[in-house]
Amino acid sequence: MKIITQKYEIDNTVSSRISNFFKTYRVGSILKASNGCKSKGVASVAIFQYIFSLVFFNRSMYMEMMSEKRVNGFAKDSVYRFVKSANINWLRFTTMLSSRIVSTTIEKLTDEERINVLIVDDTMFERNK
């Protein structure tokens, strides 16, 4: 008999919340509108969701690929090609996603008399290595 660890339950919770986020804000359609679609192979939204989830699981892609429970169905080269693709307009993607989040969620929290402002900070920062 195997014991289900607390980490497994947390991973499932985080994974379901990430999926809910992608469905609620229709990240796939925004990615497609930003030229983030592929002609063959694994869907680009699946690769993007995988990269997005790595941040919240606090894991590296290398360790995730080496783990026994690997279920993503694509190789690291697919991820690298997706990230380095010159066709994807990342500025348009971040702007459209921010706009969708504001219009569907945040705008409802403010008074109608207030002026709406969208500030997207995409500055680069250095990480200690």
Question: What is each of the regions a protein language model found here?
Answer:
Residues 1-129:
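Short alpha-helical elements
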